[in-house]
Regions:
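Boundary/linker segments of alpha-helical solenoid repeat arrays
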Residues: 15-20, 166-170, 211
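Beta-propeller domains
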Residues: 122-180
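Extended, well-ordered alpha-helical scaffold segments
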Residues: 1-12, 58-81, 145-164, 195-211
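Well-ordered alpha-helical scaffold segments within catalytic/enzyme domains
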Residues: 1, 45-63, 132-146, 180-196
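Alpha-solenoid helical-repeat scaffolds
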Residues: 33-43, 61, 65, 123-127, ...
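Extended ligand-binding groove/face enriched in aromatic
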Residues: 1-122
Length: 211
């Protein structure tokens, strides 16, 4: 069952032909069709799941090599996409502007401007959003050992932690709390700095208290 899930996730990483792009899913009718726009949730769940597979006993050397390549591809894709000209967002598979894929903001100190639907479409980041990007780079570093990814992780991690530590309203969606938890858990597992690891641990405790 786990290996079947892995093969399905791997297909989502390969179907577009764009290294690092993760499709939401693949059409069961032909095994080729997919939606051009992905989402931050899709990428985050993929990265978290693939690192878990990488560390699982079922993963042989070939599987771990495949996972390492996919996670590094995601990190490269994020590095290329998450820049000012793209509104700090992951792009669609065709290279056009996306929706629900904003990964960072010009000023991490700016407060988010939340609309009537509860989304922060402009301004700063919400607590559950802020650790996705460093999580991608942490996973790439964990499987490759390439210091470049650790450097990129740390470029965003401390601001991300500070934002995640801000008060979270009781109306937070369960899916949002879950996204925060999986990002923080991956970062906590990978972190070697004692002070930063302790802050991640406190964030995990808060997620548990709110669940």
């Amino acid at each position: 069952m786990a290996y079947a899930a892995y093969r399905g996730m791997k297909r989502c990483a390969e179907v577009s032909g764009v290294p690092g792009f993760i499709a939401r899913g693949v059409s069961p009718s032909d095994g080729k069709g997919f939606y051009l726009n992905s989402s931050r949730d899709t990428f985050s769940l993929f990265v978290s799941g693939m690192l878990a597979f990488y560390r699982h006993p079922f993963a042989d050397a070939q599987t771990r090599a495949e996972i390492a390549k996919m996670l590094v591809d995601v990190a490269r894709y994020a590095e290329a996409c998450v820049v000012p000209k793209n509104d700090y967002s992951l792009l669609r598979a065709d290279g056009k502007a996306s929706i629900v894929c904003r990964m960072w903001v010009p000023d991490p100190n700016e407060a988010p401007k939340v609309d009537a639907t509860g989304w922060a479409r402009v301004g700063g980041m919400m607590p559950h959003e802020s650790l996705r990007l460093p999580m991608f780079y942490a996973a790439a570093h964990a499987v490759s050992g390439d210091a470049r990814w650790r450097e990129l992780e740390l470029r965003y991690a401390d601001d991300g932690i500070r934002i995640a530590e801000k008060p979270i309203g009781s109306n937070i969606r369960g899916s949002e709390l879950g996204q925060l938890q999986l990002s923080v858990r991956l970062l906590w597992e990978c972190e070697t700095d004692a002070g930063r690891k302790a802050r991640y641990a406190r964030l995990l405790d808060r997620c548990a208290d709110m669940a």
